[in-house]
Amino acid sequence: MRQKESAGLLLFRWNGPELEVLLGHPGGPYWSSKDDGAWSIPKGGIMPGEDPLQGAIREFTEETGFAADGPFIPLGSITQRSGKVVYAWAVEGDCDPTKIVSIKTTTEWPPRSRRFIEIPEFDRVAFFPIQDARRAINVAQAELLDRLIGEIDSGQRAEGRGQR
């Protein structure tokens, strides 16, 4: 796995005229009381030799239990505070957030205790209107919301549709 790189998908949908995005809340005791700035796009490590988009699709399915079908809109990359580079794509789609099936991971808890617990990658996912997503999402990933809006705006102008 490429240690400092990950890839993910930003699923979006229209709720009437309002754009909404799907974000996931990390599982486990460390994150249980954190909300603002804790949510993330479904993403994860890129396997050796794996195409980043294929990694993003795989991670989306592993972390949510949902399939994502293209077309995929490239959003470029961002660098998180940890130094990790995240490659992201947007995809329009819908799902029922109450039906999440997230893979589990093992983590040491409490830290340095040598005790390990199994936790879900995400304990829940939800659709957020863009304004609420800005508050909820990891600060470094907020740029992906702006890029999504830019892609939607430029696509609508190219098709002569104006605002949705």
Predicted segments with their positions:
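N-terminal strand-loop-strand
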Residues: 1-40, 89
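Short, charged/polar surface micro-motifs in flexible loops or helix N-caps
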Residues: 15-18, 28-31, 47, 66, ...
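The catalytic Nudix box helix
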Residues: 40-75, 129
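A generic structural signal for short hydrophobic patches within well-formed alpha-helices
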Residues: 46, 133-134, 145
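Active-site-adjacent beta-strand/loop module that shapes the phosphate/pyrophosphate-binding cleft
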Residues: 78-114, 126, 148
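Alpha-helix-centered segments that form part of catalytic cores
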Residues: 115-131
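C-terminal/domain-terminus segments
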Residues: 141-155
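Short, basic, low-complexity termini and linkers enriched in Ser/Thr/Gly/Pro
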Residues: 153-164
